[in-house]
Amino acid sequence: MRKILFTVLLCTSVLNLHCSKIRERKVPEFMTAKRPTPELVYQCAKHYKLQHINIVVAQSILETGHYKSDKCINYNNLFGLYDSKNKKYYRFNTWQESVKAYKQKVQYKYKSGDYYAFLKRINYAKDPKYIHKLKKLSWDDLEYSCLLY
């Protein structure tokens, strides 16, 4: 009987300790945010280990018109990711899924070198001035400039 009681108490203590550690873990702010901001997209891209994060954040701003476009609001699609097979823009449950999809659908092709040249090479955007606009946004947007450091 003493062994059973000891075992029950020990298991209860271990379970309580485990549960308290789970409660202590903080969920990163970007994971629970309903609407994207440059700072949250930056954190999310860093979490998913995207490369050239500053450019990726600039793309999200440019593609969504500062997160105000229909594709952003209704599809949670921050990058204008398009399914050429079904001829539709991808829909995501959350904007965070869009960031993760960017890595899977765009960056998996990237090996090294000039990222702007890579985007041009894969015909990322139809706009012939896209890279110029992206570079300008990367340096001129005051809201975004805090992310450069």
Locations of regions flagged by a protein language model:
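Catalytic cores of secreted/periplasmic lytic hydrolases that degrade extracellular macromolecules
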Residues: 18-149
